[in-house]
């Protein structure tokens, strides 16, 4: 499998507070990795470094030079109720994911709109194209933002606690959709719900300042303690 990125002896801090220390970690095509660990352990910072939003204080992250930097990464952040207050509809949000790939503000082409319509249909949102976000259920809203994350055909999909805003009726469908997406992109998913994600991920990155990689979807409480990676 082709490498997507590799972290080498990477450390990150906020002022004097070291958040990640001496991290060595690599992600390749077809990986589906659950990122777990205690609150404040560095999970979200790990994602921000991959996204280029936080710079390491030492070490480095190296991306495969054969990958086009723009559109390489899709990102589904934690969703809050504030995200639904904007006067935009489903199509607007999904298509906004293409602006990252285009880099500049430009009018969307007929081809862009056709692609957005295909994503909306793929995610089971047909008929809701003109619906405002405030009209959607939690599961529908999560699908809209997932559509925004994948419309650029990323090689890597980052998910930050995706289960927090998913209603129970859509939960299984959501993870089934991730399984399909994993056929064409690697997935790195931050979650505190090991019970749910263990049926879907292939391995774990246990993050608590240090990062310990566990190459199996099965992980015991004893192993979590050995990794200094209790789950809260």
Locate predicted features.
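Helix-to-loop junction immediately C-terminal to a conserved catalytic motif
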Residues: 51
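Conserved ABC transporter NBD signature motif
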Residues: 59-73
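Conserved ABC ATPase signature
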Residues: 132-136, 140
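Catalytic Walker B motif of ABC-type/P-loop ATPase nucleotide-binding domains
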Residues: 157-161
């Amino acid at each position: 499998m082709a490498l997507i990125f590799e972290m080498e002896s990477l450390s990150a801090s906020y002022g004097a507070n070291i958040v990640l220390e001496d991290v060595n970690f690599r992600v390749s095509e077809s990986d589906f990795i659950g990122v777990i660990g205690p609150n404040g352990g560095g999970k979200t910072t790990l994602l921000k470094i991959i996204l280029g939003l936080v710079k390491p204080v030492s070490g480095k992250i190296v991306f495969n030079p054969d990958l086009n930097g723009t559109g390489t990464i899709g990102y589904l952040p934690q969703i809050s109720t504030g995200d639904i207050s904007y006067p935009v509809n489903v199509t607007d949000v999904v298509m906004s994911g293409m602006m990252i790939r285009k880099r500049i503000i430009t009018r969307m082409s007929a081809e862009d709109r056709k692609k957005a319509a295909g994503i909306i249909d793929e995610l089971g949102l047909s008929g809701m194209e003109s619906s405002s976000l405030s009209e959607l259920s939690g599961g529908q809203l999560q699908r809209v933002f997932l559509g925004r994350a994948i419309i650029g055909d990323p090689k890597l999909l980052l998910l930050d606690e995706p289960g927090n805003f998913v209603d129970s009726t859509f939960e299984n469908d959501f993870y089934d959709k991730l399984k399909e997406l994993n056929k064409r992109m690697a997935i790195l998913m931050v979650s505190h719900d090991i019970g749910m994600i263990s049926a879907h991920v292939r391995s774990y990155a246990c993050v608590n300042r240090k990062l310990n990689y566990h190459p199996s979807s099965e992980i015991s409480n004893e192993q979590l303690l050995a990794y200094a990676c209790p789950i809260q």
